[in-house]
Amino acid sequence: MATNDLSRLPFRCLARLVPTMLLLAAPAAWLQAQPADWAEPFPGHRVIGNLYAVGTAGLGVFLITSDDGHILINTGLEDSTPLIRENIESVGYQLEDVRILLTMQAHWDHTAALAEIKEIAGAEMWATEGDARVLEDGGFSDPHFGGRVSFEPVEVDRIINDGEIIELGDVRLRVHEHPGHTEGSSSYSMQVAEGGRDYNVVVANMGTINEGKRLVVDPTYPGVAEDFARTYASQKAMDIDVWVAAHGGQYGLHDKYEPGQAYSPDTFVDPEGFLAEVERLEAIYEEQVAEERQ
C-alpha cells in the first residue's frame, strides 16, 4: 500500500485477526436470499475492443486486456473464481496474467473472490479511499450491510482517485468516483477504436439505493444524499457510446446479447439507454428524499 495509506493499518490488522468461523458464519438471511442468476454461468464474450464480460448471468465482471497484462473489474460470489477463470480462457486469455484488480463497489456480490484471485494471479488490488477500508475488513465496516464479515478481506495495494488515469501497457482507463451506493463506488471509462470509429466506453456503477437505506438521516454514512446527487449529475454529463454495469439487468445484457452471437462493436452501443437509466434512478432517489423529509 502507498505510504499515505498507513493510517488504515489497524483495519488491515483487524481483518487478519478475524476468526475464520466468523467469516463462515457470514451468510445471514440477506446473503442467502440472493438472486439465482448471480451464480448462474454465462459465456464470456467480447463487449467491444479489448473489453470482455467474464462474469455470470447476473453479475458483471469485466476483463480489460493490454499488451502488458490485464485489468479485472469485480469478481462474483466467493465460489466464482473457477467460472471467471473459464470465461477468461474462453475469450483467449489467462487469469494468471491479470495485473490489476478493481471493483465498482465494495459489496460481497462483487468482491467475494478478490482475495483468492489476487493470490492466484499475484495481482495488485487498487481501490478508492471510500471502499478500501471495507475491502480490507471484509465488509465489516460497510455502512449498510456491515457489522459482520461478508467476504474474505483483501489487502489494498494502491488508492485511486477521481480523474486518475490507470495505465497498463496500452490501456488508459479513467477513474470516476460515483459514490452513494457505497462510499467509494466508482466507474471506469476509456476510448476504444473500432472500424475507423472511436467509441467512448464506460464500466458504470449505477446509483441504485439498497432497500432500507436512508438518505436524509443516515449517521453511518454522512452525506450519502449529496453523494448520490453528485453521482447522477456526473453520469448525466458523461459522453457515452457503450456501457456495461455491475449487474447484467442494469444494462440490458440479455436483451442486447445472446450466447454465441457474432461479435459487433455496436452490440452494446446505447447512449440513450444509459441516460434513461440514470434519470430513472435519480427519480427514485428524489422521491425517497422527499418522503424522508416529510
Where are the language model's segments positioned?
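Conserved beta-strand hairpin/beta-sheet module of binuclear metal-dependent hydrolase folds
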Residues: 37-91, 95, 187-209
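Accessory terminal helices/loops
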Residues: 4, 21, 31-37, 195, ...
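Active-site environment of divalent metal-dependent phosphoester hydrolases
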Residues: 80-81, 106-112, 132-135, 183-186, ...
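Metallo-beta-lactamase
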Residues: 34, 40-42, 46-48, 97, ...
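Bacterial N-terminal signal peptides that target proteins for export
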Residues: 2-19
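Active-site HxH/HxHxD metal-binding segment of metal-dependent hydrolases
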Residues: 51, 79-82, 89-165, 263, ...
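Active-site neighborhood of phospho(di)ester-bond hydrolases with catalytic His/Asp-centered motifs
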Residues: 73-75, 98-107, 126-128, 178-180, ...
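Bacterial N-terminal signal peptides
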Residues: 16-29
